[in-house]
From Swiss-Prot:
Purpose: Catalytic subunit of the heterodimeric RalGAP1 complex which acts as a GTPase activator for the Ras-like small GTPases RALA and RALB.
Organism listed in the record: Sus scrofa (Pig)
Subunit-level organization: Component of the heterodimeric RalGAP1 complex with RALGAPB. Heterodimerization is required for activity. Interacts with the HLH region of TCF3/isoform E12.
Keywords: Cytoplasm, GTPase activation, Nucleus
GO biological process: activation of GTPase activity
InterPro entries found in the cross-reference section: Tuberin/Ral-act_asu (IPR027107)
Entry's localization field: Cytoplasm; Nucleus
Coiled-coil regions, chain positions: none
Keyword Lyase: no
Name of the protein: Ral GTPase-activating protein subunit alpha-1
Gene: RALGAPA1
Length: 337
């Protein structure tokens, strides 16, 4: 076990991770050495055997860093947050079977709410989206309604899902409104970990920004979860994509024909669509050219989804594809290649 040893004796670091007499920070440093120098198969086995120790080390250090961020909030503390989130990601990736059974369900959910808080910087919120999708990919049908509501609120600009409690937004899911008639005991309010800094670059279109992130992460993270049964990777993607279609596609493509199918296409000529109405929204500061936009909502989101789908259809194969005269330099669809 642990055949790679470019950084000292990894076995000694393994022992120090499990040594309860050592402080949490020391154990964290040695846990990072183990993660960075162990073979992937050995690392999976190590996490499976010592999951309780590993989560304790992670959580204790996360709490310390969170307190430090709220007191100081300097660049060094933000770098420490990045480092501890690296450990959090490894926990999500290497322990999907336990997470699927709701291991540390409330603790992980609380941490993700702190990352997804709308008062955080965009970088932290986007990282929260990425880690939340990893968690949901592992939970699959064992998630609760709250996680599905949160998934439906990850991309700002869409209508809030309705429930028996009224509209659900990311803000009231992270910090539910108080009902003092039920109980006088209330949970502590969740506050931002890293508010936006003065030099942070903003985004004019948050809907497009988070939509692109979500579509990217539900694909590229599929194989990052180390399931013992590899079929769960595809199930995880199917779970996320089915809920994307449920919560977002009806708004992005409100007039989509549900009768259409790749296998049984409708070949009738469709009715002419009305001409879109464009309005000038602003002028370019450098060229003074007018910038127009259609009044139709989610038009940018529609373009993003179409481009995302096309990226899987038009995949460049520079060396393996056949030579077709007149198509030099063109990217061919897979069915032509």
């Amino acid at each position: 076990m642990f055949s790679k040893k470019p950084h000292g004796d990894v076995k000694k670091s393994t022992q120090k991770v499990l040594d309860t007499k050592k402080d949490a920070l020391t154990r964290l440093k040695h846990l990072r050495i183990v993660i960075e120098n162990a073979e992937s198969i050995d690392l999976k086995q190590f996490f499976d055997q010592h999951f309780s120790h590993i989560y304790y080390v992670f959580f204790e250090n996360f709490v310390t860093i969170e307190a430090s961020l709220k007191q100081k909030g300097h660049k060094s503390q933000r770098e420490e947050l990045d480092a501890i989130l690296f450990i959090f990601e490894k926990i999500l990736q290497l322990l999907p079977e336990r997470i699927h059974q709701r291991w540390q369900f409330h603790s992980i959910g609380l941490i993700l709410k702190k990352l997804l808080h709308t008062g955080n910087s965009l970088k932290i919120r986007r990282e929260g989206v990425r880690l939340f999708l990893l968690w949901l990919q592992a939970l699959q049908n064992n998630c609760s309604r709250e996680q599905l509501w949160m998934f439906s609120c990850l991309i700002p600009g869409f209508s809030a899902p309705q429930s028996e409690y009224g509209p659900r937004t990311l803000d009231n899911l992270i910090n539910p409104p108080l009902n003092l008639q039920e109980t006088q005991v209330t949970i502590e309010e969740i506050t931002p970990l890293v508010p936006p800094q003065s030099g942070d670059k903003g985004q004019e279109d948050l809907t497009s920004y988070f939509l692109e992130a979500l579509l990217k992460y539900i694909v590229i993270q599929v194989k990052s979860l180390e399931w013992k049964n590899k079929e769960n990777q595809e199930r995880g993607f199917s779970f996320l994509f089915s809920h994307f279609k449920k919560y977002y596609l009806p708004y992005i493509f409100p007039n989509i024909c549900k009768e259409n199918s790749l296998y049984h296409p409708v070949l009738d000529i469709p009715q002419m669509r009305p001409k879109p109405h464009y309005v000038m929204i602003k002028k370019d500061a450098e060229t003074n050219e007018a910038i127009y936009c259609t009044k139709e909502p989610f038009i940018k989101a529609r373009v993003i989804v179409i481009r995302w789908l096309v990226s899987f259809w038009l995949e460049p194969k520079p060396h393996t594809g056949p030579h077709i005269p007149g198509m030099e330099g063109e990217v061919l669809p897979k069915n032509i290649q």
